[in-house]
Structure formats: C-alpha cells, structure tokens
Amino acid sequence: MSIFINADSKIIVQGMTGSEGTKHTRRMLASGSKVVGGVTPGKGGQSVEIDGHNLPVFNTVGEAMAATGANVSVVFVPPKFAKAAVIDAIDAAMPLIVVITEGIPVHDSASFYAYSLTKGTSRIIGPNCPGLISPGKSNVGIIPANITGAGPIGLVSKSGTLTYQMMFELRDIGFSTAVGIGGDPVVGTTHIDCLRAFQDDPETEAIVMIGEIGGDAEERAAAFIAEYVTKPVVGYVAGFTAPEGKTMGHAGAIVSGSSGTAQGKKDALEAAGVKVGQTPSETARLLRAIMGR
C-alpha cells in the first residue's frame, strides 16, 4: 500500500502549458504516472502533445475532473497566480492538491489553506515542496523516479534535496511512499499527518522523518510519535550549524533565540524514542540497523 496516492491516481497539471509544467509532465509520464490532462485558464479546448500522449487542456479544475475523473492536481503555476489556482482546485473538491510552486506569499498560502479547511474536501501538500512518490505506482511533482525502488519505508521530509539523498541511501530497501511536505512557514500537510498515515499503512514497516530548524513542527511530531506511533522511526534535523536569525534555504528555516534549534528538536525526538542521526548517511545506517538490513 501507499499513502495519499496509488497506481490508480489520475493527475491533472495546473500550469501544464508553461515550461516547468511541460517539463515535469514529461518526467511524470516517463515514470509511469497517469497524467490525464492540464488546466490553463483561457486555453481550454486545446491539447498538448508530450512524448506520444495527447493531453487535453481545460479552463478550470472542475471541467478537468468532470472530463477525466482526475483525483490529484499538481500545481506548477507562478507565485502570483498560485492562490487562484489552488482555490480553483479546492472549489472543485479535488481530493489531493500538490503545490510545487516556490515563493508564494505566506498570506496567500495561509488564505488558501484556511479556505481548504472550511470546505473539508481537499488535502494540500506544499507549497514549496517536491511532491510525493510511491515507487512503481505514481509520482506527483518533481522527485526523481530513478533513484530508488518500492519497499517498506515511509519518508516524510521538509527538504526536497534531503528527500532525494535519503531515498538514494536506502534505495536497496525501498519506499512505500516518500512525501516532501515543504519548508514554508505554512504548509497544508504536516509531519504528523504523514506519521499518522504511515502508522496506519500496513505495508509501511519503518519511518524516516527529516526536519530542519525553525518553528516547532518537529517537537509536536515528537509528542505525537510518543503517544501514537508504534513503528520504528529514525530522524534527521538539518541546521545544527545555522546562525541565529538567518533564514537557511526555506522561509521557515530560521532560529530565533532559543526557539527552533536543531539540538532542541533532536532532544525532543530522542525523548520520544526516535533515533536521530547527525548526518543523512548516519540516519540511513540507523534505519538499517533497526530493520536488520
């Protein structure tokens, strides 16, 4: 099994006619994902030919869902148009909305996330995330499909590049699903959401959680793990050498005073029984030891 996506996921690409949308649609198709169309307001009725796939373009997500049966949307839309694109998907009751776009104003992200909660029909992953992959089943976003395989590990990460590294480090064991939740201050799906889903997934045997400095998401995840998660969890927290007050890569990755430090997050996770590596490679070794692999 997998979480959030599976072999039957039907994907539409919001912004498919743009350069990034086209490029990553091609890559998703090559990895076996079922991309069934795209959405670009004003270009409805057109089609896009990508590597032998003739993909229809629609004006709205609702039109695309009605015509294709799509149940996943991935958003490759410039930041200033992203809020409208996500609202369109929420209004259409799209079950899963994966927002890849980086640089969306925090107020816009908070607005569409709050709106999604009032509707109660859509899960948002992101923004500013690489998406998610269930190897051999579906790949939604920009995660390379050729760096790993299917297996019993669940991965949730704030960082795209660390997602890729961990998937490669553990490629011989493989993953049920890897989810990049994004590193912005406001995201639609949290570590806890993914931990809960992996705990409930019968084919996920162990979990890797990657966090980073800033905020208290990792501390809250640690409390959740202590109370709810019975499967083995290993972790890594990026940013041990980060200077105070400087944003490191992601908008949410910033240490303020004693709040949000890597050491504080590591301590909280270890208190919950999570083995935490000092490097991604050490984290992978910890998981191998737990799984006897």
Predicted regions: what they are:
Residues 1-293:
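Catalytic-core regions of core metabolic enzymes
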